[in-house]
Each structure stands twice: as C-alpha cells, then as structure tokens.
C-alpha cells in the first residue's frame, strides 16, 4: 500500500510499477559497509560466521556485506573496532561514483549523519580533506565518534545555516569533487522506513524541490576546473531526479552529464538502471574545461 499521489506518479513514470511496488513491500536486509582501512569483506564474513551469523557479499558494492538478521550490531567487536558501519548498498555505490582520489579536496554537501562521508574517507585512505556540511547539528554531531572509530583523520564536519553559508562560499572554486546527497521525499527507502510514506505528503514536494535546485546550484560553484559533481537522492520520482538535473544543465551549459553506469562498470560494478532504480537515482556531471 502506497499513498495515492505516489501511486499516480509512479504509474506514469514506470512501465513496471507493479514490480516496483512489490519490491517496496519486502523487508530490507541489513547491509554493512566494510571499512577497508581495517578489514576486508572476507575477514568480516569469517568473523560473523564464527559468531553464528550468516553473511554474504553484496550484489554490487565491493565493500558490502549483507546479513539476513538485524542484530544489536553496536555491541559487537567488529563494529566497536570500526571494521564495519551500517550502510545501504545503494549509498555505497554513490561514494564509488564520486571516485575520490588520494589527497583531493572533497565536499559532502548534505552529509547528514555522515555515512557517505565515511565511505569517501576510506576510499581516500584518510588522505586529502573532506568537508562534511549539514544544516542539522544534531545529526552531524554523530559523525565525530564514527570518524574516530573508523580511524579517519581527513574529515572536517561543519554545521551550515543553509546552502549560501559563508563557509560554503569560501570554498567556491576549490573542490575536486562535490557530492550532493540532496534532501528528498525518501520514496526509495520505504523498504527500510515504511512509516515514511504516510509522513511525507505531496504538498511538501514543491518545497523540497526548490531546496534541491538551490543546493545543486551552490554546490556546483565549489568545483574547480575539471572537478566532478555527483547529485543523488533516495527518491524514485523523476521530479526530484532527472527534472532537477535537466533544469540545472539548462542553466549551466558548461556542465555535461556522464554515464553513471559506465563509471561503475570501470570499477567492476555491473548494475543496470533497472536494478538501480530501487535505490533512488544518481547523476554525475563535469564542468567543461
């Protein structure tokens, strides 16, 4: 069961909307992201097996380990030692799209609790500098202990008032990579957050849509020449994804869209748009030199 407004939009947008809704009703497994600074997926699976927990590698992300049960993970040594963090496989793929390199300057523009920030930090082997921005001080506060547990020293969390904050403007033209994990309706997370479908109404779409467009505009200004901008949501709605990107590209003809699936494919991650749609959506853009 989904809200009528979402059903009406999905029917128009997806030819296979029935399969999509069925997938939404299934309970989600627990995905872990292995912190490769401290362990390998094989080592984590072996440790879990020794404790009688069945685990397997994820379908797409090289760092993903999937559990069929949802244990009190925070009490386990592998969690306390920073070997794993809880992160949906789709979110792990977004860090792979950013493809940060050692020593680069990176901004996670809407960092939230910092799950993707930590994934970026591990990919950068704790080198360079990552700015983790968010307007929610309470959510961002959880990042510092998680950083320490993960053994990362290259992350700099900062609370901002909005996307036009002076802290943001000071970094215009300085970033190698910027990730915009935009605030959204969360329609792609109903498997994990089933109550969300009744908390977010169609009337809020207009407001959140304006925020999405404003955030991506500001984030783009942070890039240096040859940088990379990644826009992602956990929404299945075209209005929050392709439409936002189309508007942005119309306003910014000096940017071009890359093929996200080719970027993942070159990293050995084979996933089709059909398989990816249950995670939400993502786009990679480059400013023209």
What are these regions (language model features)?
Residues 1-289:
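S-adenosylmethionine
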């Amino acid at each position: 069961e989904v809200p009528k407004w979402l059903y009406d939009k999905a029917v128009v947008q997806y030819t296979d909307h029935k399969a999509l809704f069925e997938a939404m009703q299934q309970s989600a497994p627990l995905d872990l992201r292995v912190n490769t600074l401290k362990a390998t997926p094989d080592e984590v699976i072996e440790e879990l097996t020794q404790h009688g927990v069945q685990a397997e590698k994820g379908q797409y992300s090289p760092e993903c380990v999937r559990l069929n049960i949802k244990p009190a993970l925070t009490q386990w040594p592998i969690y306390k030692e920073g070997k794993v963090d809880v992160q949906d496989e789709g979110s792990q793929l977004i860090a792979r799209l950013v493809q940060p390199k050692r020593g680069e300057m990176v901004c996670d523009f809407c960092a939230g609790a910092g799950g993707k920030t930590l994934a970026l930090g591990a990919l950068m082997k704790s080198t360079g500098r990552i700015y983790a921005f968010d307007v929610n001080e309470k959510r961002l506060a959880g990042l510092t202990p998680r950083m320490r547990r993960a053994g990362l020293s290259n992350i700099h969390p900062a609370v901002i008032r909005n996307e036009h904050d002076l802290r943001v403007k000071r970094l215009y033209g300085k970033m190698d990579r910027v990730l915009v994990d935009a605030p959204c309706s969360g329609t792609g997370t109903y498997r994990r957050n089933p109550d969300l479908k009744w908390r977010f109404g169609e009337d809020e779409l207009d407001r959140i849509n304006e925020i999405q467009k404003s955030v991506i505009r500001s984030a783009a200004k942070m890039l240096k020449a040859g940088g990379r901008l990644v826009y992602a949501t956990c929404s299945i709605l075209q209005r929050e994804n392709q439409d936002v990107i189309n508007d942005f590209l119309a306003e910014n003809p000096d940017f071009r869209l890359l093929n996200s699936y080719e970027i993942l494919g070159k990293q050995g991650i084979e996933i089709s748009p059909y398989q990816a749609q249950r995670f939400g959506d993502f786009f990679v853009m480059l400013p023209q030199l």
